[in-house]
Structure formats: C-alpha cells, structure tokens
Amino acid sequence: MEARELSLRYGPKTAIHKVSLAILDRRVTALIGPSGCGKSTFLRSLNRMNDLISGTTHSGTILLDGTDIHDRGVDVVDLRRRVGMVFQKSNPFPKSIFENVAYGLRVGGMKDKAELATRVEKSLRGAALWDEVKDRLDESALGLSGGQQQRLCIARAMAVEPEVLLMDEPASALDPIATAKIEELIHELKSTYTIAIVTHNMQQAARVSDRTAFFYMGELVECGPTEQIFTNPREKRTEDYVTGKFG
C-alpha cells in the first residue's frame, strides 16, 4: 500500500501536505510525531475513514495493489474490509463475544453456522483471546477487561480477512500487562498482515515496528528502518523528537 503526494484538508485547514509513504507488505510501520502532526489523519486516509468527516478534501493518490482507492469504481465497504481498523478506544458492540466477531461475516452474507463458528474461533485464536473466552462466547463482550476488549476488536477486524491492519494507538488506554499482550500480538500478526500503527510511545514504536515514519506539522519528515530512525536519523527534527527535546 502506498500514498503518493497525499494532501488532506478539513475545510480550509491542511492536515497533511504532500505525503509520500509506502506501507510495506508484512511489515509493521510505526507513525510517530507530536499531537496534531497528521499521523492519525494519514492513517485514517488509508481506508477512507476521513470521508465520514464533513468538508474533507484530498489530492494525491493512495494505491492498494496498484489501484487508487479513490477511483470511482472502488467499493468503500469492500475497501474497509481489505484495510481493517483498530481504534484507540476499544469499541465492542453490545452483543455477545461470538456475535462481535461474527458481525462483519454476517454483514458480508455468511450464514452457515459451522463456517461462522470456524472463522470466529480462528480469529479469536489469532488475537490470542480464544483460551480466555472459549467457555463464555455467549456472554456480553462488555464484560471483558479493557485489554480483552481491544483484542476482541482486533479479532473482529481479522475475521473478514483483511490484507492491511491499521491501528490507532491500540494500547494507549491499557495497563502495562495488557499493553505487552497487544505488542506480542502485533509481532505475531505481521507474518500474515501488513500493519501500520500510530503511537505516541517511543519505546513501543521501537519495540514493535520494522519501519518508522516521523510526521511533523502535517508533513512526513523522515521514514526508514526503525533502528536507524531511533539511533541515527538523517533529519535534526527527527533526532530532537526521538530524544525528547520536543513533543
């Protein structure tokens, strides 16, 4: 997946300006930068979530398997199936654990009970949650802990078999133990999925990502291998940010 010269405006305000960035297959790309720098706006652009905000306009292109996701013929619902999203705050539906994961499958037309059960189990196993919930699938998802709810949301995104997973600060509201489980899960998921993650946590970016992109004031300042970004960045602004001189 790749953005080329992508700019996005909310009304008259430019949120990101001419960003060109490739999200490499089966790698984790971390998007870092101070609050308001455009990293979450960029992330939401990758599956057109910004379309839901009134007054949003864009220029440039975003390619998924060589096709511009803004082409007239693109089915936005299918795009969001192919490019799944996990939000900062876990958002389980007020349904059972099983129905949370099955929701997207049912919307997509899957009706066979055995097939649904197989896909739900596969997704919960993939999200490292199955062993914790297998005996209470009919219970409300709202009864899960915060960390479990976030992994449930990851399972729900995985159930429809996306190609790309977008994560907007998925562990920011979690305690250290739950955060460690999410980070371990991200390591496991990258063998199957292309992942882009927004994080304010520099240590987390260093731990989970293969590549890191630094945004500042709506522009992409620098992108490269994570180790290089944190130990030998090319740009002084990047160095100042990762060493804590501003944030």
Curated annotation (Swiss-Prot):
Q: State the Gene Ontology BP annotations.
A: phosphate ion transmembrane transport
ABC transporter domain location, by residue? 1-242
What SUPFAM superfamilies is this protein classified in? P-loop containing nucleoside triphosphate hydrolases
Q: Where does ATP bind?
A: 33-40
**According to its record, how does it sit in the membrane?**
Peripheral membrane protein
**Where in or outside the cell is it found?**
Cell inner membrane
Supply the EC number(s).
7.3.2.1
Catalytic reaction(s) noted: phosphate(out) + ATP + H2O = ADP + 2 phosphate(in) + H(+)
| Keywords on record | ATP-binding, Cell inner membrane, Cell membrane, Membrane, Nucleotide-binding, Phosphate transport, Translocase, Transport
Q: Name one GO cellular component term.
A: plasma membrane
User: Gene3D superfamilies this protein is in?
Assistant: P-loop containing nucleotide triphosphate hydrolases
Q: Which GO terms describe its molecular function?
A: ATP binding; ATP hydrolysis activity; ATPase-coupled phosphate ion transmembrane transporter activity
Family, per entry: Belongs to the ABC transporter superfamily. Phosphate importer (TC 3.A.1.7) family.
> What is this protein for, i.e. what is its function?
Part of the ABC transporter complex PstSACB involved in phosphate import. Responsible for energy coupling to the transport system.
Subunit annotation: The complex is composed of two ATP-binding proteins (PstB), two transmembrane proteins (PstC and PstA) and a solute-binding protein (PstS).
Q: Per its record, how is this protein called by name?
A: Phosphate import ATP-binding protein PstB
Q: Which organism is it from?
A: Myxococcus xanthus (strain DK1622)
